[in-house]
Amino acid sequence: WTYVPRFNRNVLMISQGGQQWFDTAYYSGVAATAWSWNVRFLDADLDGDDDMLVTNGFAFDTMDMDASLRIKSAQQSGSKDARALYEMKKLQPRYNSPNMLFRNEGRLRFTDVGEEFGFAHDGITYGLGVADFDNDGDLDLVTNNLNESPSLYRNTSQEPRIQVRLPGGVGSKVRLVGQGGTTTREIVSGGGYLSSDSGEVVFAAGVAGQSEMLVVEWRDGTKPTRIERPVVNSIYTVIKPSLARLLVRGEVTKTTPMFRELPDAISFRHFPNLAKDFDENPLLFKRFSTAAPAMLCRDFDNNGRLDFGFQLARSAGVQVFLNLDGDNFRSVTSRYNDPSGLMGNAGWLDGFAVIEGKPNFVGALNKTIPAIESLTQPAALTLRGDMDGDGTADAIYITQNTLNDHPAESRAMVFLNQSGSFRRAVDWEQSLGALGQVTSAVLVDMDEDGDTDLLVSRDLGAIGLYHNRGDRFVDVSEAFGMLEFVGLWQGLAVGDFDNDGRVDFAAGNLGRNSPMELYPDGLVHLGRGGKSRLSLYAIKRGSVHLPVDDMDLYANVVDRARLPAMYRQFSDIDLAKVLDSFDGLRRTRLNCFETSVFLNRGGKFERRALPYPAQFSPTSGINVADFDNDGREDLLLSQNLYSLRPDWGRLDSSAGMILLGQGDGRFEPVRAGVSGLAILGDSRNALVVDFNRDGRTDIVATQTFGQTQVYLGQAGKP
């Protein structure tokens, strides 16, 4: 079943170098600006950063659902001639909306200061032109308002500036080189709705220290014009030199990217077992039937090279790709299916899955655990580690949350290895209890006492830590300061990110570039599993839970008689008056959406959000490796989410994110044009390993509905 995403919002496309552009509108705070027509970037306050101006309004509020119902009723009962249709159109109210000016706060964040700056006319504004009408060196504005006089806005900023005019210079670039860096602007013409600008560019001259040079790079290749030591608060008109002075362009120096793709090296494409998720519950945040494929890495044919295996959908077996020479792979499909779910991601430090390869791997890829072969509920995760300290690998089997029981709790089943025979350990299971909606888990010695502890990430919850006491687990999440961060946590990966000898971990989350950013006061999830399951979000204001979604969506999951007759009334309704058994719903207030690292401070964890480019897209999987061979641990984030509700579109502003560790708990993001990664699909997990044995870490990344991508490491010296 296919649900087509819709994009009823603004986008802000940020260049990543090369041919990649990512949308950050939610993160930047500009996704919703009413009915908008024109957008301009200019440095309104002359602080060195471009601000954003938006004109708004429309003659008819076509989104007024109450008016649409009145029109529909009139169409069914009245005349359909042109005059009658015009009169019906007048049933839609005028949509006056204030214009908006967003101040650039840095790091791609914007704040609406239209009222403060005097650009908040409440009406219907279509055209927007920019020019220096009073010749004072800054840029002024003119707008065209429907059924009103135009508006003229004078820029009253007193900050120092330098203006440059290039007659006939459309497409040329002007650079101001200063002590603090270089600012670049391009001469553009048109591009606005019913509007054009005069073509001047203005630089803030008091930000980067003394201005050292103006450089004009002409569009047609004419040799650049340079002006040494430009005078502040001056207007420069630069005439293009003779075409005889053409610049002969040399070769562009290209740096070697960190990774090189091997196209079609592994021809595995994942197609999950789809269900009618949104037909079952149209209020779901995302689909649950688009799970990522399980993957593993082992030397299946004992030739000394690491091979790869992927679980096929619908229990069709496992597809194995044999590593022939480090660059080429051969596909072999096993008929083995995985009823016990043992192809879940393993929580080992090396990131390998739990399947144990055998020389005769076709049809026998796994040493199953007999005690759980008969279980019918699929596993989200199967972990292996020595929990009871007897030197043998035990197993934890964690049930997954499915569409039919969301948002029910995950449960763990513990199996102790006793001389090769697995015994179910009920005492261990009872010590864990209900685990929440587990999305990832790791067995690792977090408290350095020599045994394996359990770390879990949760959807609609906080990260949990359970210490191993030798005969049971003890929940120490609150003591370690982890319960205060409630989010949509996904993948986990462990390492020592600050080189203090303690185990730290990284956790994936929704990020800060999603529809959740439209609700700065935060959202509350209301959920109930079982036969009367329900999952929805609400805005909490005092004791009232206000709806986030359209009334029509609620009509699919609650009694229509409980809903008001008018859509406008529904926007202010308390959901407690709509939902059956409201008191039985679990309420979860979300307060943390940032993908983060947690640094172990000995008895406490310090959370640090990863740098802001890592928050542009949801992170489902995380890998730890030294990608640049500098001796410090780096991160690979598997990102993007295509399975949101159709009216919320897709979250796909990542090509796979590399973050280079600095050895002190900090990470520096690598732009896609530098990393060489182009994992543009819905990527949930990856394997990182040196499979061509050149001393550099390579990447194999899966994509839901997409081609598996293979990248060879090229960074640093082996």
List the predicted regions and their residue ranges.
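Acidic/hydrophobic-patterned starts of short beta strands in beta-sheet-rich repeat architectures
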Residues: 47-55, 135-144, 302-312, 356-364, ...
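Gly/Ser/Thr/Pro-enriched helix-cap/hinge segments flanking short amphipathic alpha-helices
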Residues: 91-100, 104-294, 371, 422, ...
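Beta-propeller blade termini
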Residues: 37-46, 126-134, 291-302, 322, ...
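Solenoidal tandem-repeat scaffolds enriched in leucines and small polar residues
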Residues: 384, 393-415, 419-444, 457-459
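Blade-loop segments of beta-propeller domains
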Residues: 330-354
